From Swiss-Prot:
<protein>
    <recommendedName>
        <fullName>Oxygen regulatory protein NreC</fullName>
    </recommendedName>
</protein>
<feature type="DNA-binding region" description="H-T-H motif">
    <location>
        <begin position="172"/>
        <end position="191"/>
    </location>
</feature>
<dbReference type="GO" id="GO:0003677">
    <property type="term" value="F:DNA binding"/>
</dbReference>
<keyword id="KW-0963">Cytoplasm</keyword>
<dbReference type="GO" id="GO:0000160">
    <property type="term" value="P:phosphorelay signal transduction system"/>
</dbReference>
<dbReference type="Pfam" id="PF00072">
    <property type="entry name" value="Response_reg"/>
</dbReference>
<dbReference type="GO" id="GO:0005737">
    <property type="term" value="C:cytoplasm"/>
</dbReference>
<dbReference type="GO" id="GO:0006355">
    <property type="term" value="P:regulation of DNA-templated transcription"/>
</dbReference>
<dbReference type="Pfam" id="PF00196">
    <property type="entry name" value="GerE"/>
</dbReference>
<keyword id="KW-0010">Activator</keyword>
<comment type="function">
    <text>Member of the two-component regulatory system NreB/NreC involved in the control of dissimilatory nitrate/nitrite reduction in response to oxygen. Phosphorylated NreC binds to a GC-rich palindromic sequence at the promoters of the nitrate (narGHJI) and nitrite (nir) reductase operons, as well as the putative nitrate transporter gene narT, and activates their expression.</text>
</comment>
<dbReference type="InterPro" id="IPR016032">
    <property type="entry name" value="Sig_transdc_resp-reg_C-effctor"/>
</dbReference>
<keyword id="KW-0238">DNA-binding</keyword>
<feature type="domain" description="Response regulatory">
    <location>
        <begin position="2"/>
        <end position="119"/>
    </location>
</feature>
<keyword id="KW-0805">Transcription regulation</keyword>
<feature type="domain" description="HTH luxR-type">
    <location>
        <begin position="148"/>
        <end position="213"/>
    </location>
</feature>
<dbReference type="InterPro" id="IPR000792">
    <property type="entry name" value="Tscrpt_reg_LuxR_C"/>
</dbReference>
Length: 217
């Protein structure tokens, strides 16, 4: 199987490439350092599996890239690699189309197993996360009480890209340059974000981003 690894740390890309290339049925054909590059590498190689870090440079996080890649290249299975053992992250990536979720501190054998699992089309969840997943379903009554305040359901993909950048202090021009859009487009999205989330000021937006853990994306 062909594999692409996307992580902003070179040591992670190199280390995981060595582990996977040692397997007879696996070949790491390329690596990427951010979400934009990950999309380009998937388009170039059409890999069977993309292993992608959830938190990469702002503007194109693993979560945003996952949604775009799933939409454009549905045959590529995405395994999210992360240090966050938080069910919120888990549910967000699964909703966006990822097939697996594994922690960075997982043993080598577990990584190999995870890759093979998603390659087969099955879903892989790090064993440390299964308890959280079960508890969530047990407590779920069929109606998500927080859905009206869930940014991943309220905001568009572009708005989810822009919100963390605003909260981190980037100006409209800087955001426009990062996302290759006009300043007017950024301003319009900012207005829509504030309206959709019922926020009145930038401090409220920053507080919201922190509470929803959006600054990690």
């Amino acid at each position: 199987m062909k594999i692409v690894i996307a992580d902003d740390h070179a040591v992670v890309r190199t280390g995981f490439s060595m582990i996977l290339n040692f397997q007879d049925d696996m070949e790491v054909v390329d690596t990427a350092a951010d979400g934009v590059e990950a999309y380009q590498k998937v388009m170039q190689h059409q890999p069977d599996v993309l292993i992608m870090d959830l938190s990469m440079p702002p503007g194109e996080s693993g979560l945003i890239a996952t949604s775009k890649i799933v939409e454009s290249f549905p045959d590529t299975k995405i395994l999210i690699l992360t240090m966050y053992d938080d069910e919120e992250y888990l549910f967000h990536v699964l909703r966006n189309g990822a097939k697996g979720y594994i922690l960075k501190n997982a043993p080598d054998e577990q990584l190999i197993s995870a890759v093979r699992t998603v390659y087969r089309g099955d879903t892989y969840i790090d064993p440390k996360m299964t308890t959280s997943l079960v508890n969530e379903f047990v407590n779920n009554t069929g109606q998500d009480a927080n859905s009206t305040n869930d940014p991943f359901r309220i905001l568009s993909k572009r708005e989810l890209e822009i919100l963390p950048l605003i909260a981190k202090g980037y100006g409209n021009k800087e955001i426009a340059e990062k996302l290759f859009v006009s300043v007017k487009t950024v301003e319009a999205h900012k207005t829509h974000i504030m309206q959709k989330l019922n926020l009145k000021s930038k401090p409220e937006l920053v507080e919201y981003a922190l509470k929803k853990k959006l600054l990690d994306f």
